[in-house]
UniProtKB/Swiss-Prot annotation:
The primary product of this enzyme is 4,2',4',6'-tetrahydroxychalcone (also termed naringenin-chalcone or chalcone) which can under specific conditions spontaneously isomerize into naringenin. Pathway: Secondary metabolite biosynthesis; flavonoid biosynthesis. This is Chalcone synthase 6. It catalyses: (E)-4-coumaroyl-CoA + 3 malonyl-CoA + 3 H(+) = 2',4,4',6'-tetrahydroxychalcone + 3 CO2 + 4 CoA. It comes from Glycine max. One of its GO terms (molecular function) is acyltransferase activity, transferring groups other than amino-acyl groups. The active site is at C164. Its EC number is 2.3.1.74.
Amino acid sequence: MVSVEEIRKAQRAEGPATVMAIGTATPPNCVDQSTYPDYYFRITNSDHMNELKEKFKRMCDKSMIKKRYMYLNEEILKENPSVCAYMEPSLDARQDMVVVEVPKLGKEAATKAIKEWGQPKSKITHLIFCTTSGVDMPGADYQLTKLLGLRPSVKRYMMYQQGCFAGGTVLRLAKDLAENNTGARVLVVCSEITAVTFRGPSDTHLDSLVGQALFGDGAAAVIVGSDPLPAEKPLFELVWTAQTILPDSEGAIDGHLREVGLTFHLLKDVPGLISKNIQKALVEAFQPLGIDDYNSIFWIAHPGGPAILDQVEAKLGLKPEKMEATRHVLSEYGNMSSACVLFILDQMRKKSIENGLGTTGEGLEWGVLFGFGPGLTVETVVLRSVTV
């Protein structure tokens, strides 16, 4: 006969949650940012809006994005003219695409992560699936379970419509699951496809145009678990997490699922709101570790846009190289919502190993991962790198 206390103790892992593998995937269709404005205005039958086109060109030039990947290619858009309009009922057409494509792209990223992890997929105990693209029942988590051939008893968590902070949310949840369920191995998948947000231009709603200049498609997957076996190779420890709603930020970023798809609204002062509150989040996270020099840690910040990164850098006096991995992902992929920070995590460990920097975190021990999104919500994750 065992006591409840003994049962509870046996359920808990001994060590911290670790990221054991990372995989990423994008659709094959790649768009060049320099030629995108001409293509976008042509495909949406908006070539007559010359002034707006010039404005959009300036947005794309300032975006610091070189290229993006998109499931929506010219052929698909020509078959779905309602998706190209600014505000035409088109949710059915959009849903038909994402319900299939979101799990499919997620599978590609997950397969790569599982391969790197090197363990049989039957050892996956939990699945967290996150997407801002579309909603369905049973969800993308169920579809992915079937596509990958995971055990039917895998414990699934489906997160829909969280937005750009959710790359932090999934790591926070995965940490709690791994540390409170001994032997747990959590597959985390973020898969984002812009088919729900793509629409033609409007000169009365410029914030919608900002999204058209920034958003791209991508999926990322990680395996999270505590107490790694000798065959498992941890990449980062997940040490501490937090989520907070910024003061006076209501309505700064919001999205609404309508007949016309997912509409986005952004206020101009989003970079200001984030940079004004970033120090407080860092103090809360790093004071217990005795760290107050934020150039001494490695950085993974959701690249909502270049202005956010610029203002955070300026506010904290960060050296330009601190945001190198973050800016690289923005430049090569655009803003992929929840998947972005996991792409940056992947880029950071790869470059750190390539450059022989001694740890997975650019040679440094401690690091921070930030998610920023609707609310305005900020997710903070304290990371500890691994010696390589």
